[in-house]
Amino acid sequence: MKLDLFLLAIIPILIGMFWIRSKDRYCREPLIHLIKFFLIGAFLSVIIILLENLLMKFNVFEGYSELIYVSFVVAGLVEEGVKALILIPALIKEKHFTEKLDGIIYSVFLALGFATIENMVYIFSESRNLALQVGINRAVISIPAHVMFAITMGYYISKYKFEGNKNKRREYLFMAVLIPILLHGVFDFILMIEYRWAIILLIVYVIILWKINLDKLEKYMNHSKKVFFGNLRKKKKK
């Protein structure tokens, strides 16, 4: 294994982990539990890759129909669907999932576990020169996109967990699964369009994703801060 390619694959992941960890400032999750979800994501990548390869054998489409099938079904549905299938029940059972921000933190760690193996596969399956280009492209575009999909999923899982209304809970559960699938599908669809203007569209799309999801993240960070200092004041009164 070439060290420089390995570092190219792993450094963006480590940056993502430190970044999202830094957002959990007041009631921090135990690192061992975050690593557990990271490893779950890495394990899921094997299952996801096998499922994607299987579905590609049923690809009988051409043109834009093929792009839709590959981006929304093979990539979006399988990757985000499998993550949600495992993440949601695992998170609901997680005893340290005590505030809304936690849903995002755990979701991103799981997604980064998946992205680690995916990065390795993409980078080490190419020739050296192409591997460097692939690694840089993924570090700048693909890894941040995975983080954004995970923030969306974690955001709605948290709304599902802490909502008292049953109808609302079902709605949030549905959104936790469907919205990341659609966001991922649109991302891959744009990525596969063979037009020069597609890269501009992709950059705009990623910027919009960042803006929307950073707002979601900030909302839960503010909620975490409010809860922390609220509990602190209650303890002082006692």
Curated annotation (Swiss-Prot):
The chain crosses the membrane at residues 1-21, 31-51, 72-92, 104-124, 139-159, 173-193, 197-217. InterPro entries: Peptidase_PrsW_arch/bac, PrsW. One of its GO terms (biological process) is proteolysis. It is found in: Cell membrane. The keyword Transmembrane helix applies. One of its GO terms (molecular function) is peptidase activity. It is a multi-pass membrane protein. Belongs to the protease PrsW family. GO terms for cellular component: plasma membrane. It comes from Clostridioides difficile (strain 630). Residues 22-30, 93-103, 160-172, 218-238 are cytoplasmic. It comes from the Bacteria. The gene is prsW. Keywords: Cell membrane, Hydrolase, Membrane, Protease, Transducer, Transmembrane, Transmembrane helix. Pfam families: PrsW-protease. Disruption phenotype: Reduced expression of the extracytoplasmic function sigma factor genes csfT and csfU (5-fold in mutant in comparison to wild-type). Decreased virulence (30-fold less virulent than the wild-type). This is Protease PrsW. Its EC number is 3.4.-.-. Residues 52-71, 125-138, 194-196 are extracellular. Involved in the degradation of specific anti-sigma factors, specifically RsiT. Involved in the regulation of extracytoplasmic function sigma factors expression. Seems to play a role in the resistance to antimicrobial peptides. Required for colonization or survival in the host cecum. It is an enzyme of class 3 (hydrolase).
